[in-house]
């Protein structure tokens, strides 16, 4: 049987009329600031912390809607995780696909296609790493080359880095 204190806590929470995310307490913020310092070596002040509502895709959608307006061109490498391109089309933005190409046993960016499309008025690029569905962890050189294309064409990059603390196969 379940301990009475657990049953009581569940009943108390279930009686609350809102089932959404609760208010974050100070220990949560302390843990985030501690992790950022320990893992990444930088200190963040409490007043500089801002947390998005539930989930990365929701947050990326909000950012996309703030940075663009309906009809703006948004590029997404394809294939890709459905919610990343769905947020573009459902928000009335123009989806511009840039294909990933199979080369030397793995997917990589088609830089020529990326460059041509970025120069055609793309406002935002949506990225993810590791890439979903291919699983590719982009090499530093690939990211730097892609960012140069977008910097040159004044494109904003929105990147899903939800797995940034997970290091795969020697990648950093």
Model-found features: residue ranges?
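N-terminal small-domain helix-loop-helix segment of the aminotransferase-like
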Residues: 1-57, 62
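Short hydrophobic alpha-helical segments of the AMP-binding
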Residues: 32, 87-88, 150
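Catalytic P-loop NTPase motifs of RecA-like helicase/translocase cores
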Residues: 59, 83, 165-166
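Conserved PLP-anchoring active-site segment centered on the Schiff-base-forming lysine
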Residues: 66-88
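Short beta->alpha connector loops at strand-helix junctions that form conserved
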Residues: 78, 97-102
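A short helix-loop-beta submotif of the ANL/AMP-binding
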Residues: 90-96
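Active-site phosphate-binding strand-loop segment of PLP-dependent enzymes
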Residues: 100-171
